[in-house]
């Protein structure tokens, strides 16, 4: 079976949720004997030099990247008002990338073309023109749902109007795209149910993001910093910013009153300026984490206080694989078949979130039990080889690939 992954960001190094999801699936394809080809936009925002990519991966993945600037800009956002297409989508279309795609399709016959995320569906017309491969959307999220959730909390009238317009266009594009797919691969059953409700009748397969759990279990010698809670995520994704703001505004002061020596560490690239300048007691900001394993092992309790978003939080999978006790909202843990109180703590209201964090800070035995439960759950659910093997079987059995 020959698969082409078309990506909106370079997957290596896998240092954020979406690149981890893309890279790990590709690694799983290769391990399962699938001939993999990767064609990706290498964005200005998330630029990753080809020279830093291991030669073995480049060869095995027939890797090719095309540099493009997908940054949001005022002119593009304004000019888009005179278009019928969502700006969220149009900023991922480039003639240069299309030319590279056409050359790839002319040179190689594929069985499956897997679009990594909705935005790459803008290339479906050219795919259909030059290939007979089955077209599959790997839906990392329900994109319009993220923005519909965000709009409920938007206070600026002008911004709400503009984002409302873009969200409506995005939803129209997302639903129109369904008509041109042969299958969908979702990351959660919740997202699968949304596509089914929207009338998609063709095969849908839920394939959670897998990880190499044995690799995550490797420890480093750094001593754990007691009474530390942390949020570690890409801070150029709006729901993550909202999550940190919610925690700081509604939870942190109450936690600190009950556990005065507690420390909150928020980490992640592209930290917004207003969060860099946060002046709260016992709060530390780390903009760039050089060694994720060291960071996870040093800090005790992981927080995922998301109020919006869709899809799966890869950081929760990573956290569980590292054996971290995690406190999350229900939205944050969507798509994971957790058992509340056994392998994660779920809390949605500020008072419940505060209590969950304080209990773990004060009760070492409870924290240790949650750590064991998280790691055991990760070993059972997230093994990458098993995860991707199931998808390969789906492609062969359902799509005759």
Question: What are the roles of these predicted feature ranges?
Answer:
Residues 1-64, 108, 254:
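N-terminal subdomain of nucleotide-sugar transferases
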Residues 206-298:
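Conserved catalytic-core segment of nucleotide-activated headgroup transferases in glycan assembly
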Residues 344-351, 359-365:
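Conserved acidic donor-binding segment of nucleotide-sugar-dependent glycosyltransferases
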Residues 315-318, 325-329:
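Short hydrophobic beta-strand element within catalytic cores of glycosyltransferases
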Residues 366-380, 387-393:
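A short, well-ordered alpha-helix in the C-terminal region of glycosyltransferases
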Residues 164-167, 171-218:
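Donor nucleotide-sugar binding/catalytic pocket of nucleotide-sugar-dependent glycosyltransferases
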Residues 182, 294-311, 322-325:
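Acidic donor-binding loop of glycosyltransferase active sites
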């Amino acid at each position: 079976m020959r698969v082409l992954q078309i990506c909106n960001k370079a997957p290596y190094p896998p240092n954020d949720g979406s690149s981890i999801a893309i890279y790990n699936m590709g690694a799983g394809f290769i391990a399962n004997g699938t001939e993999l080809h990767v064609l990706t936009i290498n964005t200005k925002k998330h630029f990753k030099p080809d020279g830093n990519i291991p030669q073995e991966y480049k060869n095995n993945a027939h890797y090719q990247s095309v540099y493009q600037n997908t940054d949001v800009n005022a002119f593009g956002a304004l000019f888009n008002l005179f278009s019928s297409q969502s700006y969220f989508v149009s900023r991922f279309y480039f003639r240069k990338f299309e030319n590279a795609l056409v050359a790839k399709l002319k040179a190689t016959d594929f069985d499956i073309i897997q679009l990594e995320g909705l935005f790459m569906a803008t290339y479906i017309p050219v795919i259909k023109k030059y290939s007979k491969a089955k077209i599959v959307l790997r839906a990392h999220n329900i994109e319009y749902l993220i923005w519909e959730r965000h709009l409920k909390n938007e206070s600026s009238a002008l911004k709400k109007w503009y984002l409302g317009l873009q969200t409506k266009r995005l939803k129209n594009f997302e639903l129109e795209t369904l008509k041109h797919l042969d299958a969908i691969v979702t990351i959660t059953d919740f997202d699968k149910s949304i596509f089914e409700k929207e009338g998609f009748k063709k095969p849908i397969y839920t394939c959670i993001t897998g990880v190499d759990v044995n690799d995550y279990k490797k420890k480093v010698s750094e001593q754990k910093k007691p009474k530390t809670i942390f949020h570690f995520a890409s801070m150029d994704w709006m729901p993550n910013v909202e999550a940190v703001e919610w925690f700081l505004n509604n939870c942190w002061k109450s936690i600190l009153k009950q556990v005065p020596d507690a420390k909150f560490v928020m980490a992640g690239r592209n930290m917004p300026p207003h969060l860099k300048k946060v002046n709260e007691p016992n709060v530390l900001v780390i903009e760039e984490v050089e060694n994720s394993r060291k960071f996870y092992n040093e800090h005790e309790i992981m927080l995922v206080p998301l109020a919006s978003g869709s899809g799966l939080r890869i950081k929760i999978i990573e956290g569980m694989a590292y054996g971290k006790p995690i406190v999350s909202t229900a939205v944050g843990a969507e798509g994971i078949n957790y058992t509340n109180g056994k392998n994660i703590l779920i809390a949605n209201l500020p008072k419940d979130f505060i209590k969950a964090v304080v209990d773990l800070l004060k009760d070492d035995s409870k924290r240790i039990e949650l750590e064991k439960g998280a790691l055991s759950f990760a070993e059972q659910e997230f093994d990458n080889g098993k995860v991707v093997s199931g998808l390969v079987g789906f492609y062969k059995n359902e799509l005759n690939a």
